[in-house]
Amino acid sequence: MAFLALFALAASAAASVCQRTLHDGWRFRQGSSEIWHPARVPGNTHLDLMRERIIDDPFFRLNERAVQWVDKEDWMYETRFTPTVSELSATNQVIVFKGLDTYADVYLNHQRICEADNMHREWRCNVKGILKEGENLLEVYFKSPIRRNIPKFDALPYRHNTGPDHSQIGGIFDKTISPFARTAGFEYGWDWGPRLVTFGIWRPV
C-alpha cells in the first residue's frame, strides 16, 4: 500500500508539470542595427545570416575571410509568447536554455534573468514574479567574445601556447584568445574547418 501511495503521488506530480518549447517567432539583428531578420531556434547567427543572404557560404572558396566581421559584433535575439493558464498558476516557473553560445544576457519583460558565459552547460532561469499574463518578451543579447576576451589576452604577463586558433584569419593578429572562452574550440579554426566564432541559441529552449 505504501508503494502504491508513493507511486500515485509521483504520478500526480508528474502530471502537474507542464512544459513546452519556445522555438517559434524568433528574430535577430546586429547589435548596432535596428533591422530585424527572422531567426531559427535552435540555430546560430552564421546560419541565420546565410538564410537572409547577408553572408555567403563560408565553406566555399575564401568566403571564410569575408565573414570575420560577424564575431566582432553583438547580436540580439527576441521572441514573444503568451503563457497558458496552467503555466501562470504553476508553483515554479522556469525558462531553460539547453545551450547558449556563449556570452549572453537574457531578459524577460526587460528584467535580466540570466548571464551566460559557457556554451557547454544549460541555464535555468527562474521567472517567478516576472512571467505575466498576456504577451511576454524574451530577449537574448549575445556579446562579442572577441571584444570580451582580447583584454584578458593583453593582460597576461606572458604569451601562452595554444592549439589551433586561426587568429590571423580572424584579423586579430597573434591574439589567440580561444582558451579564455568556454566555447567549442573548433569555432576558432582547425585544419579541417574554417574559423567561425559564432553566436546563438544552439540547443532547445
Which residue stretches match the model-derived regions?
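Carbohydrate-interacting regions of secretory-pathway proteins
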Residues: S32-S33, F60
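Short Gly/aromatic-enriched secondary-structure transition segments
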Residues: I35-G43
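Cleavable N-terminal signal peptides of Sec/SRP-targeted secreted and luminal proteins
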Residues: A2-A15
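Terminal low-complexity, poorly structured segments
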Residues: M1-A5, T45-H46, P58, E115
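Surface-exposed, low-complexity/disordered Ser/Thr/Gly/Pro/Asn-rich loops and linkers
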Residues: D57-W69
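Accessory beta-strand-rich segments of carbohydrate-active enzymes
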Residues: C18-S32, H46-L47, E52-R53, K72-P204
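Helix N-cap / beta->alpha transition motif
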Residues: P42, P58, N126-V127
